[in-house]
UniProtKB/Swiss-Prot annotation:
It comes from Levilactobacillus brevis (strain ATCC 367 / BCRC 12310 / CIP 105137 / JCM 1170 / LMG 11437 / NCIMB 947 / NCTC 947). It holds the Pfam family RpoY. The gene is rpoY. Keywords: DNA-directed RNA polymerase, Nucleotidyltransferase, Transcription, Transferase. A non-essential component of RNA polymerase (RNAP). The keyword Transcription applies. One of its GO terms (molecular function) is DNA-directed RNA polymerase activity. Its EC number is 2.7.7.6. RNAP is composed of a core of 2 alpha, a beta and a beta' subunit. The core is associated with a delta subunit, and at least one of epsilon or omega. When a sigma factor is associated with the core the holoenzyme is formed, which can initiate transcription. This is DNA-directed RNA polymerase subunit epsilon.
């Protein structure tokens, strides 16, 4: 499953919508997607959304779409 992870770069500052970023990640479950991001980044995760079907096709049209892979 592909997940879109919305996050802030810094865990110490209060989240601001204008500073929200996103990344795309392939993981078996939402819990595992969260664990991967937490283990490999300092991001403050706001929301994780499973995307598939037409939504995924739409996201893939964005030139900034790229699956993030973390090395173990």
């Amino acid at each position: 499953m592909i997940y879109k992870v919305y996050y802030q770069n810094d865990q110490k500052r209060n989240p601001k919508r204008e500073d929200t970023h996103s990344l795309y990640l392939e993981a078996p479950t939402e819990v595992e997607a969260r664990a991967l991001v937490e283990a490999h980044t300092e991001h403050n995760i706001e929301f994780i959304e499973a995307i598939e079907g037409e939504t995924l096709a739409y996201e893939q049209q964005n030139p900034n779409y790229k699956l993030t892979e973390f090395s173990e």
